[in-house]
Amino acid sequence: MSMTDNVADMLTRIRNAYKSKLINVSFPSSKIKTSILDVLQKEGYIKDYIITHKNNISYTEVALKYSVNGDASICEIHRVSKPGKRVYSAIKDLKGYYNNMGIYILSTPYGVMSDREAHIKNVGGEVICKVF
């Protein structure tokens, strides 16, 4: 069975891994997933990720980040723009998520970036997901 939303699958795997207190999680790799993981790493939500190749298929393995007392660094991670309903936003219409404690991840003409970086560059785009 083919998968229609690879990004939602990645976000669900990360969310389930945090709920299960796993150290690592892996899933099939793609360019958009790598771009989203770059933003998550830059914002401090994950430790690191590596791309491995098995049987001519590339996989991404993500090292999850926990606090000293064992709390997950990601409390919520949700898909906003879906294949059936794309959500676009100008940067002036995008309010802070959880009083600027969380982030939106946007796909812009300048690449995938957080809402904080998009505010600096004054550019809007497709709202991929929100993370807190």
Curated annotation (Swiss-Prot):
The keyword RNA-binding applies. GO terms for cellular component: ribonucleoprotein complex; ribosome. Disulfide bonds: none annotated. Keywords: Ribonucleoprotein, Ribosomal protein, RNA-binding, rRNA-binding. The keyword Transport does not apply. One of its GO terms (molecular function) is structural constituent of ribosome. One of its GO terms (biological process) is translation. It comes from the Bacteria. Pfam families: Ribosomal_S8. Belongs to the universal ribosomal protein uS8 family. PANTHER family: 40S RIBOSOMAL PROTEIN S15A (PTHR11758). One of the primary rRNA binding proteins, it binds directly to 16S rRNA central domain where it helps coordinate assembly of the platform of the 30S subunit. Part of the 30S ribosomal subunit. Contacts proteins S5 and S12. This is Small ribosomal subunit protein uS8. It comes from Rickettsia canadensis (strain McKiel). The lineage of its organism: Bacteria, Pseudomonadati, Pseudomonadota, Alphaproteobacteria, Rickettsiales.
